[in-house]
Amino acid sequence: METAPKPGKDVPPKKDKLQTKRKKPRRYWEEETVPTTAGASPGPPRNKKNRELRPQRPKNAYILKKSRISKKPQVPKKPREWKNPESQRGLSGTQDPFPGPAPVPVEVVQKFCRIDKSRKLPHSKAKTRSRLEVAEAEEEETSIKAARSELLLAEEPGFLEGEDGEDTAKICQADIVEAVDIASAAKHFDLNLRQFGPYRLNYSRTGRHLAFGGRRGHVAALDWVTKKLMCEINVMEAVRDIRFLHSEALLAVAQNRWLHIYDNQGIELHCIRRCDRVTRLEFLPFHFLLATASETGFLTYLDVSVGKIVAALNARAGRLDVMSQNPYNAVIHLGHSNGTVSLWSPAMKEPLAKILCHRGGVRAVAVDSTGTYMATSGLDHQLKIFDLRGTYQPLSTRTLPHGAGHLAFSQRGLLVAGMGDVVNIWAGQGKASPPSLEQPYLTHRLSGPVHGLQFCPFEDVLGVGHTGGITSMLVPGAGEPNFDGLESNPYRSRKQRQEWEVKALLEKVPAELICLDPRALAEVDVISLEQGKKEQIERLGYDPQAKAPFQPKPKQKGRSSTASLVKRKRKVMDEEHRDKVRQSLQQQHHKEAKAKPTGARPSALDRFVR
């Protein structure tokens, strides 16, 4: 009789899990050591990484660096380096052609260096000397970092530069679009809108949104960077001008009869009937004022924060269709048919100044961002640039074949003029210098006559409205590369825009402070001060700030007689008079010393020189 085997007898023992020899894991940088069988094809070679281990450096091994302050060697941190630079490979197995940090030119480092190493520092205590060594080492490291990060800065604008003898005006937009990157090339586009043209356009203060209105009632607003349409309506009425208000959420449209306010969804919010037959619009962002010029000859200021008419000024010069603002002092410039340009402020009923610019009527006016130069064009086919720093004299003049109907300045001082269907752009030496009218910087021909011009803020883009629609041109060097994120941020969110609106309303500048020279607001008003002092004296009957008369103290033993008191009073008065005379003589000698020539001594024959 067969019996079942006892457990553990004639049965192969189970393998112990702990005693099982596991396969050693292979890392991706280790070589393949598995032997291949006969006839089997070897697999694809694995990416190897011949990175050698860095040997540990002893703690006492320092890099000796000579110091100019003391003979004690400095101990800066040693940068990490591979033993074999050829073995620096990435995960893909490729080798970095430029290992290590990028070299920095010595000239650039010296520009950021704040320590003059040519001067010898005085020897001092050991503690102070060590502090100076550490400060010098930190300063050197900081200057190197600043020089390396200078490549990321964009303060210097990049203009279009041709080769020797090449005229940049012959470079067309297609060549520029082909040469720039994809993101910049997308900023050049054409909107074919011949059905409702001609068009007027306006960019928001942040430069992110574009609004345009056609003469046949077409009004639209969009984010021109992403090409996302915000609103599009037809007001069924002629549109003469269009402007963004303090943000892209509100839009002012000058229609045939009255002024209308819309939001970014195309919903009409207000209809201002006191501003009738408006031809041109300008918005003053720091004062929240919307300036309107009408066919009736009135210049009207509307405070959009409270919805009140601040001032309605009669220019007494007929129809107003040429208007521009000075961004520096918020003064409105109006061009008239008699060839003059008048400067207006809501605080005055008369113009602040009048400038005779042309023999015929003025067709266009533009002021640069610094408020220094003004460009005008007239019916006499002349383009002039005036200096607004008190002289109001023309700096340069150029006669154009057809005359400019529209002018605009960029943030970097470029001047654009629209003449028929041609757009000419002139560039200067810099932001603070006037544009040179000798040779145009760029030239472009459009599909129809120009009806509106404006440079996009913080972008090298020029928007042109014409009878065929809207054209966005690329103009290298036109926009300001650096923007203030707290003032005009193109990338702000909705919450940031709301917070900025509250802050801007709290910091709103009153309309009464608009003047030609804003620096005069920080000066003392001497006339008002003297008038107030005179009124105070009349009200009190005496001058509270007058110096009290001298009263001699009484003395004993007969020395306080009447003659003695009069003598002492006269002595004090004479002393004060002598001080005044001495001070006037010193001032006179100082003036004579300044007027005295520093050259050779004058000759008696100089009076015969003419």
From Swiss-Prot:
This is WD repeat-containing protein 46. It holds the Pfam family BING4CT. InterPro entries: BING4_C_dom (IPR012952), WD40/YVTN_repeat-like_dom_sf (IPR015943), WD40_repeat_dom_sf (IPR036322), WD40_rpt (IPR001680), WDR46/Utp7 (IPR040315). GO terms for cellular component: nucleolus; nucleoplasm; small-subunit processome. SUPFAM superfamilies: WD40 repeat-like (SSF50978). One of its GO terms (molecular function) is RNA binding. Residues 65-77 have a biased composition (Basic residues).
